[in-house]
Curated annotation (Swiss-Prot):
<comment type="similarity">
    <text>Belongs to the UPF0473 family.</text>
</comment>
<dbReference type="Pfam" id="PF06949">
    <property type="entry name" value="DUF1292"/>
</dbReference>
<dbReference type="InterPro" id="IPR009711">
    <property type="entry name" value="UPF0473"/>
</dbReference>
<protein>
    <recommendedName>
        <fullName>UPF0473 protein RBAM_024480</fullName>
    </recommendedName>
</protein>
Length: 93
């Protein structure tokens, strides 16, 4: 995972792979982390899309980094606020 990627493959607990589209990535200085918001590509246009979030650390050579779970309520609140701002800006366009 690195900034600017458009698709990522998520592997669930059972080892199933799911291709997802990256909505956007951002960095947060408060938590000193990078975050990615994404959703499954196979979601239908008329279905409500479930957006997922993870933190990630790009590796040193700029290739795929490791996704990590969001750990605190404070992080979730910050992510929700960032997502709401993003969606509001998209609606204005």
């Amino acid at each position: 995972m690195e900034h600017g990627e458009k698709h990522i493959t998520i592997v669930d607990d059972q080892g199933n792979e799911q291709l997802c589209e990256v909505l956007f990535t951002f960095e947060n200085d408060t938590f000193n982390k990078s975050y990615v918001l994404y959703y499954p590509i196979d979601a239908q246009d008329d279905d409500e899309i479930e957006i997922h979030a993870s933190s990630f650390e790009p590796n040193e050579n700029g290739e795929d980094g490791e996704l990590m779970p969001i750990e605190t309520d404070e992080e979730w609140e910050m992510i929700e606020e960032t997502l709401n701002t993003f969606l509001a800006e998209e609606d204005e366009e």
